[in-house]
A protein has these predicted regions:
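Short, glycine/charged-enriched secondary-structure capping and boundary segments
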Residues: 19-22, 41-42, 66-69, 90, ...
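N-terminal first-folded block
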Residues: 2-50
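Charged phosphate-binding loop/patch that engages nucleotide di/tri-phosphates or the phosphate backbone
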Residues: 3, 98-124
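Short glycine-/acidic-enriched loop or helix-start segments at secondary-structure transitions
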Residues: 16-17, 38, 62-65, 86, ...
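Acidic, metal-binding active-site segment of PIN/NYN-like and related structure-specific nucleases
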Residues: 45-63
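Mid-chain, well-packed structural core segment of small domains
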Residues: 60-94
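Hydrophobic/aromatic beta-strand patches that form the interior of the parallel beta-sheet core
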Residues: 27, 53, 75-77, 106
Length: 124
């Protein structure tokens, strides 16, 4: 499965470069849509069929409390301290089971991975 990524503005540029060098299709909000709010980022991920990767916990509220329509998958990275290259390594590790992430909101803490199904509802 070829994943198309949308990495949020808070995703480190060195990890974007590593992922692209490994052949991944990565759209970086910091490079092309800087300043877009979370709702716009979510809509872009959904429109382009990209998996959203973020360090921003607000997406959980948008998807589960406010019922915005989800993209194919969301990966929330909740690691308090890391080197800028590490997120690319984490995503490679998570891709070992990509079908286990599809249709899910996944939280990666550095030591644990938790997923819950995304609720496919109409956009708010």
């Amino acid at each position: 499965m070829k994943v198309r990524w949308l990495v949020n503005e808070n995703f480190p540029a060195p990890s974007v470069a590593i992922m692209r060098a490994s052949g991944h299709d990565v759209l970086s909000i910091a490079e092309s849509h800087s300043g877009d709010d979370d709702v716009e980022v979510l809509a872009l991920a959904r429109k382009e069929g990209r998996w959203l990767v973020t360090f921003d916990q607000d997406y959980g509220e948008l998807l589960f409390a406010r019922h915005y329509a989800p993209p194919p998958a969301v990966i929330l990275l909740r690691v308090p301290s890391y080197r800028p290259e590490e997120p690319a390594v984490w995503l490679e590790h998570l891709l070992c089971k990509p079908n286990g992430l599809l249709g899910k909101f996944t939280v990666f803490t550095g030591t644990t991975v938790r997923s819950r199904p995304l609720l496919h509802q109409s956009a708010t």
